[in-house]
Each structure stands twice: as C-alpha cells, then as structure tokens.
Amino acid sequence: MSKITNNVFLTIRNAINISDVIQNYIKVIKKGNNYWAICPFHNDTNESLSINDKKQIFKCFACNHAGDVIKFVAEYKKISYALAAQEIVQLMNLDLNLLNHLQKISPQEIKKNKVFDLNKQIQKWFINFLNNKNNIHVIDYLTKRNLNKNDLAYFKIGYAPNNDELLNLIKSNYNNLIQENDEFELNKLIENSFLVIDKNGNYHDFFNDRIIFSIYDHLNNVVGFSGRIITNEKTPKYLNTKTTAVFKKDEVLYNFHNVITIENNHQLFIVEGFMDVITIHKSNKPNVVATMGVELTNKHLELIKSYGIKDLILCFDNDQAGFLATKKQIMKLINSPFNIFIVNHKDNDCKDMDEYANKHGYSATSKLLDQQLHISEFLLLEISNTNKSTPSLKHSYKQECFTIIKKYGDIFYVDKYVDFMKQTFSIEENLLKKVIEELLINKQCNSIQNKKNIQSYQKQTQLTNKLTTSNPKVILTKIDKHFNHLVVIILMNRVFLNRLDTQVRNRLTKEQSLVINIIEDFYLYHFKINNILKNTDSFIEFINKNYSKYTNVINQLTKMVQIIKYNPKFDNIVAFELAKNNFIYEWLNNQIKRLKLINLNLNMNNNQEQIINNEKLIKQYNDEKILLDNLINASLFHKNQ
C-alpha cells in the first residue's frame, strides 16, 4: 500500500469504533467487553464473529475470517478497499478531506486487491493438493513432524506437487479465471512466484514438491507463500515468494494476523522459522511470530507497537548463529520502547524449539519458554566467561558488570544482579545491593527529569514545609502511596505505561490493576493524547461512561486529576511525582551514588576512616531525601483548605 493510503486507512481506523460501523451491516450484540454477531462470511448459525473495539478488529472463531473495519466492509460488500474506506467516511460523517485523499489513490491499489484474490485462490488449490489421496505421503511426513489436522487448518498449510500440477490446473481453469481476475495473466503469475519460464520459453511451477506455508499481512490478506522441501536436499530448504508490491519480508511477520486477535495480550515471542511458530503455538503460547530469516526492522517494530505489544521475547536458534542473531537483535532493540527478554535455552542439546518439543514434549517446552532472561541478565551471562585471573582483569570485569547493569538494567531485577555478582566478588551483600539500587534509580531519574527540574531543586524544597504541614488525606485509599506515585507519572505521560512489563503487572493488587487498565484504555481510545493531566475533562468523561460501576475508584481518580490540575502548587512540583521504589530526585541520588561507589572501593581496601567520613555525608543527603519524600507524598495527598 502507498504511504498516503496507509495514512488515510490508519486515520479512519483510529477515528471510529469498528462495532459502530459493522452494526450498520449486520446485527451485533454486546457480551462482556466485545460485540458478537453471526458471521456473514460462512454459513454461520451461532454468534461466532467477535468484534473488538479496543484492537479495532473482527474475527470469526468458526471460519477464522479476520481483519479491520475496512476489510470487513470491502469483503461484505465485495468492493475494493478504497471504495470501502470512502463508504465508511460517508457513513460515519468523518472529515470529507479523507475522501479527496481516497479518490487520489492510484489504480495500483485496486490491482493489489486483485493480487490478494489471486493468492487466496491458489492457496485453496495448495490446500486441495495436500488433501488429495495421491499425496498421502505428504500427510504422513507432516504427521511425523507432529502436525495434526487442526494445525494444518489453523495455519492454512498446503502442498505444491511435482510435475507442474499447478500449471495444469491453471490452464484447465484459465478461461474462467481470466474473466474473474485479470491477474491470472501469465506474466502476473510469474511476477507473483507461481510460475517460472525456462530458457526455451516453457512455463513450469515455481514451487515443486514442497510444503506450502501461507503468509498473511496484519489485515488478514494472503500476501505470499513459503515452500519447504520434503526430499530433495540439493535445493534450498525454503523457497519464498519474491518481493512484490504486496509481499515485503521487512514489513510482514508470519502469524501476526493471528496474534492480534488474542485478548489482552502484551507479549510477543519472536522466532526464526515457521515450525518454531507452530511448536510454540502448540505449547500454549499462541502469541508468537517468525521473522522469516530477516532481522526485525523498524517497520516490524512500528506494526508491533501499534497493537499495544510491550514485551518482546526473543527465542532464536540455540546455536552459534542463533546466539549471534540474538545479540545483533538486542543491540537494535536496546533503545526501543519495548521490554526485551530472551528465552533461556540453558545447555540443552536441541537447535530450536521444534527439536526441543519433539524430544521433551509440549508441556516441557511451555516451561522452557517461561524461563526468560531480562536483556541485562543475558548480557551479564555473556561476559561471565571473561578472564578474571589477575586483580586487574577482575577489576575490569567488575566495572564491565556495573556498566551493563547501569546501562541496561532494571530496578526490578536488583536481587538477580546481586546474586550474580556476589558469586564472583567478595563484596558485602547489603552494600552491593545498595550500590546497584542507586545506579538504577539514578538511571531512571535521568530518563524522566530534565535539567530545568534539577536546577530548580532548591526552589522546590522551600515549598516542603508549607505542603507537609497540611492534614493529608489519601486520594486512593486502598492503593499504597508508592503506587500513587506511579499513577501520577502515568497520568503525566503515556510512555511510562511501557515500563509496566508483565512481571510488574502480576504484582499489582486487583484494584491497582483496575486503575492501570482504566488509564491504559483511555490512552488506547484517545491515541493522540499523551498527557491525561492536560486532558482531564476527556478523561473524567471517559471513565464515568465506561467504568461507572466502579464508583469508589472512579471518584478517587477524578479527585486526583482535579487536584493536580487545579492546585497551582502542582505546576511547580509535578515533576517530583515519582514512584518511590523506582524514581527519586536525581541530584540527591547522584551524590549518594558517588559516595557509595567510593565506599565500595574503600571497603575493599579497608580504608575505614574515609568510609566513616563518607557515611556522614551520606546521612546528610539522606536527611535531605526525607524532606524530598515529604514533598513527594504531599503532592499526592489532598491538602485540606
């Protein structure tokens, strides 16, 4: 799709609720958080079609038909995507300027839709070839690979026989096909990797004696195919559709069209190949995609991010090539908004997840997939075999460990860092823990505070006495004050939601999870808003409309945002609304960190006199920290007037 088309379609998708559009064509019923309807794309008798406003997609759990609002209208009315988009604009009274853009879409967009139709038809033939009784040997092969009928149907797996059977089928149907779709013109079949032409001008099948994997885009269009050899080891193991207008490997992730239909999913397993996807899916982890032999690209990451995925779990092959691929991918992802984890293969003798499942079973595979390393743990393990035979080398190794923790670490893994380092260094555990905590707290402060906030520290602390002399009243009575800090930060900027990885969310109470979900839903619904505190009216209207049954939490959240918005003191101190266990003011922590690092080295050299002097300074800074704590707490409590 062209850039202009992508932008217009995305604008339409974000401007409406998919259920509001679909109910103009079929009857929908709300059940829970989703809407349901009788699927119009197959002979449905039950309400099998799920419509999810949060993800802006529909999916039939009977026929697996799925896609976004534009795809629904296009296929329901049997019109092009461009015409479907125009109809939605008019139906929902959207900005008429969108019509002008849509009408400028080139005829090439229409041709792409015809390619989708072409791919869909030939996909059916590949599947029919697989189910042909003459090809029972292929079913036997797949059965030995632990693929059953449900797997074949779910992943739309087919077979391309030998002897140009696809070419013969095309010839026998050519007259009818060419009337329905001019993409069956022979040069189009070559362009889309169904036929090849030899040096004598004769046509042949592109795929021969290969298992066929269907590749979809995120809109559930069949965009290409990949064929795996069965017997002929002299040819490439995989043969893929060549790059076309609709198939670009740097934009497509295998199985992503299925992943985005999973409810409340924030994690994504990333593997290299098709069989690994199927294996992990069968191990009760359906949220898995394959990169199909390429690195994750910026286009991949933009696509993943647009569907609310927050945790990326790398699970590449367990060999030297896979290890290098993991390292390379980590370096690309290190500054991304995602939380990065790596499946810990340990020292098993299996190259990939498919081999592991064949040897140990799917239950054991599921447990292995749960053994994930945070990116910082992975990097620490990588350097663990460093030469430490001399004091100098050991010191360099220690500094490298601290550098990794400071640069890539996370406050939630402090205990793991301590356990790792105490095995090598003779450092008192509590002291080591404090030093690591300071490194990470300071790092997190750097990520959210600007120089102006730091320079205004003295001015802000002058407000402490006035603010803390009030009679404080907790805003969220059942949510502890540390969580209050986190809530305010998330209200200030949506990017901090990305810090809440799955492990953090699992620690929240039921009421805390509700608060986070409410804020998250608002940001998802209002995709252009990044700061709730600047849009309090919209937020209050949203929560009262959608969460009215949670009266207590709604009232308390309403009170919180109103206090922050209308209390002028918050204009000066809102930057200090930091989670106590995650964030603290940078200036003080810089000093404490510096002193403790000095003491760490002094402790190793038994310089007790200087240690005592530094401890006095640390106490002084900690006293100032207490005042800062009062300031933070006061900013989260209601000051009685």
Swiss-Prot record:
<dbReference type="InterPro" id="IPR050219">
    <property type="entry name" value="DnaG_primase"/>
</dbReference>
<protein>
    <recommendedName>
        <fullName>DNA primase</fullName>
        <ecNumber>2.7.7.101</ecNumber>
    </recommendedName>
</protein>
<comment type="similarity">
    <text>Belongs to the DnaG primase family.</text>
</comment>
<keyword id="KW-0804">Transcription</keyword>
<dbReference type="Pfam" id="PF13155">
    <property type="entry name" value="Toprim_2"/>
</dbReference>
<dbReference type="InterPro" id="IPR002694">
    <property type="entry name" value="Znf_CHC2"/>
</dbReference>
<feature type="binding site">
    <location>
        <position position="317"/>
    </location>
    <ligand>
        <name>Mg(2+) 1</name>
    </ligand>
</feature>
<dbReference type="GO" id="GO:0003899">
    <property type="term" value="F:DNA-directed RNA polymerase activity"/>
</dbReference>
<dbReference type="InterPro" id="IPR034151">
    <property type="entry name" value="TOPRIM_DnaG_bac"/>
</dbReference>
<dbReference type="InterPro" id="IPR037068">
    <property type="entry name" value="DNA_primase_core_N_sf"/>
</dbReference>
<keyword id="KW-0238">DNA-binding</keyword>
<dbReference type="GO" id="GO:0008270">
    <property type="term" value="F:zinc ion binding"/>
</dbReference>
<keyword id="KW-0479">Metal-binding</keyword>
<comment type="function">
    <text>RNA polymerase that catalyzes the synthesis of short RNA molecules used as primers for DNA polymerase during DNA replication.</text>
</comment>
<keyword id="KW-0863">Zinc-finger</keyword>
<keyword id="KW-0235">DNA replication</keyword>
<dbReference type="InterPro" id="IPR006295">
    <property type="entry name" value="DNA_primase_DnaG"/>
</dbReference>
<keyword id="KW-0862">Zinc</keyword>
<feature type="domain" description="Toprim">
    <location>
        <begin position="266"/>
        <end position="348"/>
    </location>
</feature>
<dbReference type="GO" id="GO:0005737">
    <property type="term" value="C:cytoplasm"/>
</dbReference>
<dbReference type="InterPro" id="IPR030846">
    <property type="entry name" value="DnaG_bac"/>
</dbReference>
<feature type="zinc finger region" description="CHC2-type">
    <location>
        <begin position="39"/>
        <end position="63"/>
    </location>
</feature>
<dbReference type="Pfam" id="PF08275">
    <property type="entry name" value="DNAG_N"/>
</dbReference>
<feature type="binding site">
    <location>
        <position position="272"/>
    </location>
    <ligand>
        <name>Mg(2+) 1</name>
    </ligand>
</feature>
<dbReference type="InterPro" id="IPR006171">
    <property type="entry name" value="TOPRIM_dom"/>
</dbReference>
<comment type="subunit">
    <text>Monomer. Interacts with DnaB.</text>
</comment>
<dbReference type="GO" id="GO:1990077">
    <property type="term" value="C:primosome complex"/>
</dbReference>
<dbReference type="InterPro" id="IPR036977">
    <property type="entry name" value="DNA_primase_Znf_CHC2"/>
</dbReference>
<dbReference type="GO" id="GO:0006269">
    <property type="term" value="P:DNA replication, synthesis of primer"/>
</dbReference>
<dbReference type="GO" id="GO:0000428">
    <property type="term" value="C:DNA-directed RNA polymerase complex"/>
</dbReference>
<keyword id="KW-0639">Primosome</keyword>
<dbReference type="InterPro" id="IPR013264">
    <property type="entry name" value="DNAG_N"/>
</dbReference>
<keyword id="KW-0240">DNA-directed RNA polymerase</keyword>
<dbReference type="GO" id="GO:0003677">
    <property type="term" value="F:DNA binding"/>
</dbReference>
<keyword id="KW-0460">Magnesium</keyword>
<dbReference type="Pfam" id="PF01807">
    <property type="entry name" value="Zn_ribbon_DnaG"/>
</dbReference>
<feature type="binding site">
    <location>
        <position position="317"/>
    </location>
    <ligand>
        <name>Mg(2+) 2</name>
    </ligand>
</feature>
<keyword id="KW-0548">Nucleotidyltransferase</keyword>
<feature type="binding site">
    <location>
        <position position="319"/>
    </location>
    <ligand>
        <name>Mg(2+) 2</name>
    </ligand>
</feature>
<keyword id="KW-0808">Transferase</keyword>
